[in-house]
Amino acid sequence: MADGWMARIDDALAQRRREQTYRERWALSGGNDRLIRDGDRQYLNFSSNDYLGLARHPEVIAAWQQGAAQAGVGAGGSGHVTGYGLHHQRLEQRLADWLGFPRALLFTSGFAANQALVGALTASGDHILADRLSHASLLEAAMHSPATLRRFAHNDADALQRLLRRDCAGNRLVITEGVFSMDGDRAPLPALAEITRAAGCWLMVDDAHGIGVVGEEGRGCAWAPAGRPDLLVVTFGKAVGVSGAAVLCATPVAEYLLQFARHLIYSTAPPPAQIAAIDAALTVVRRGDALRQRLWDNIVRFRRGAAALGFALAPSDTAIQPLVIGDNLRTLQLAQRLRERGVWLTAIRPPTVPPGSARLRITLTSAHLADDIDTLLEALSDAQLQNA
């Protein structure tokens, strides 16, 4: 029987290799920085989610160090035991006030927050209606829940409305992202919010890639009242530059999650030092108009240059600028050609993206210089010609 386990593992790994979808990791230095090192070779980094460059911001680093000195490096337990402290309480209140919700609850990661929220709220007879391109954490949570999952065409409010007319029984939860992690486009939140309110169902938005970057003071995609969801998930590992996540919701929902969200109840709380760093990073985010403007300038420079070179980019006005290649092997080869030219880009392939849509996921940050963008464009042009 033991051999059956290894046979299953060997078959799965062999299939990934055949399909050119085998994932690898590199032990890199400076993965959150503008420049990255692999061994003795240095590259321009265009794969980081640290959109505002806060992972190395001196105020954020100092806050982490001070938090560790004052409160230690671990929380010591679940938030339901001894792990929830004044740092956590203060950050939750600050988030709720800033984003316009009655309550906020901290989680160890965005994946955990999404899984906990969907798993705790849904029951048999409910319906989940999710954008087809929603993040794996959302779709997996929906598939593992007792609810019936239906997917609607990407960013298609009319398709959602048709599904809502068809699926009338039980509670209904509509799920989408603010900024889509692999495509960089934004959900039409005002239209989705209007439809869900009219239908009497709830809207859940994962704004991992919008918070800090989009909206007034970086409040994200859902900051305007017209697009306000019932449930908002924000994460701190992208533009905020740290890690962790929070769920924003009504007070009864927060109390319910404290009773029934197993990912929250049975996980050690985030370290106080991490919470202090997030708090400091949010201060930088709120006054970070100059950082957001620098990021926007880089986005405009890249898109104009790419258009001049004839590249067909996705309709994204965010830090995520995917260049869809299609074929898995060709995408891997193009990524390798770029590394030979000193540019680090990751080849994203199925199952992360749909079959036939393998891509280079180009991410721009406020730390990039204009010369960096020009180097990227030149390298893309040269590598594309060689890879044709």
Curated annotation (Swiss-Prot):
Keywords: Biotin biosynthesis, Pyridoxal phosphate, Transferase
GO molecular function per UniProt: 8-amino-7-oxononanoate synthase activity; pyridoxal phosphate binding
Pathway recorded for this protein: Cofactor biosynthesis; biotin biosynthesis
Cofactor field: pyridoxal 5'-phosphate
Residues the record lists as binding substrate: R23, H135, T352
Positions carrying N6-(pyridoxal phosphate)lysine: K238
InterPro entries: Aminotrans_II_pyridoxalP_BS (IPR001917), Aminotransferase_I/II_large (IPR004839), AON_synthase_class-II (IPR050087), AONS_Archaea/Proteobacteria (IPR004723), AONS_Proteobacteria (IPR022834), PyrdxlP-dep_Trfase (IPR015424), PyrdxlP-dep_Trfase_major (IPR015421), PyrdxlP-dep_Trfase_small (IPR015422)
PROSITE patterns the record matches: AA_TRANSFER_CLASS_2
Any Pfam family hit: Aminotran_1_2
Gene3D superfamilies: Aspartate Aminotransferase, domain 1, Type I PLP-dependent aspartate aminotransferase-like (Major domain)
Family in the record: Belongs to the class-II pyridoxal-phosphate-dependent aminotransferase family. BioF subfamily.
Designated name of the protein: 8-amino-7-oxononanoate synthase
Gene assigned in the entry: bioF
